Amino acid sequence: MAMKASIKGKYDTDKTSGIGSLAFNAGDIKLRATMTDATLVAGPTLTGLALAVEKPGSFIVEYNVPKKDVRFQFMNTVRIAEKPLNLTYIHSRADNRTIVDGSLVIDSANKLSANHMVGTNNCKIKYTYAHGGLATFEPCYDLAKNTWDFAVSRRFYSGDNVRATYQTSSKLLGMEWSRNNKASGFKVCASVNLADELKTPKLTAETTWNLEM
């Protein structure tokens, strides 16, 4: 039985936190336990502990131990006019919330996605255009707010990825720099609210270490 472990540390201007996970592969089923720093610092306790059973590409069942909440996620792919449509159904029992997500891959460069919370008018439609496999442009329309969000990203052969986002509803401008490989990764984010008179930037940094046994 193969085992994978990962540790993620996060620092921002307000606090420092950590998340750890252990995953075991049992055939085509993956068993995963996730813990936050609150699980170990004060105890050990059950705070921040979540257990999950996953079959990649098919389903995920996650149990939040302290909240006694179950979250179901089911994935499937159908074909429309020979184009793959990836569907995801997510239901959280505690707040009785259901989300349906669909993504239609038109070709290698174009993708159309929609996300809808059942029983509400919350719906977002996003178009993704990938240029040359390195640059990506993503406009997103929020039907409930009648606003647009935009994201532009650029991937480099070194493994670095730079991403810029702008939310027109909140006037929030964000920048992100990340790098991921098999053993480790990091992400540095900066955001500023352009509607804020002071326009004070908020900085966060994440580091991830991966171990496979």
Curated annotation (Swiss-Prot):
The chain crosses the membrane at residues 4-13, 19-28, 33-42, 56-64, 71-80, 94-103, 109-118, 123-132, 145-156, 160-168, 171-179, 202-211. It is found in: Plastid, Etioplast membrane; Plastid, Chloroplast outer membrane. GO terms for biological process: regulation of monoatomic ion transmembrane transport. Keywords: Chloroplast, Ion transport, Membrane, Plastid, Plastid outer membrane, Porin, Transmembrane, Transmembrane beta strand, Transport. GO terms for cellular component: chloroplast; chloroplast envelope; chloroplast outer membrane; etioplast membrane; plastid; pore complex. Residues 1-3, 29-32, 65-70, 104-108, 133-144, 169-170, 212-213 are cytoplasmic. Its main location: plastid. Residues 14-18, 43-55, 81-93, 119-122, 157-159, 180-201 are chloroplast intermembrane. One of its GO terms (molecular function) is porin activity. InterPro entries: OEP24. It is a multi-pass membrane protein. Belongs to the plastid outer envelope porin OEP24 (TC 1.B.28) family. High-conductance voltage-dependent solute channel with a slight selectivity for cations transporting triosephosphates, dicarboxylic acids, ATP, inorganic phosphate (Pi), sugars, and positively or negatively charged amino acids. Homooligomers form large rather nonselective pores in plastidial outer membranes. This is Outer envelope pore protein 24B, chloroplastic. The gene is OEP24B.
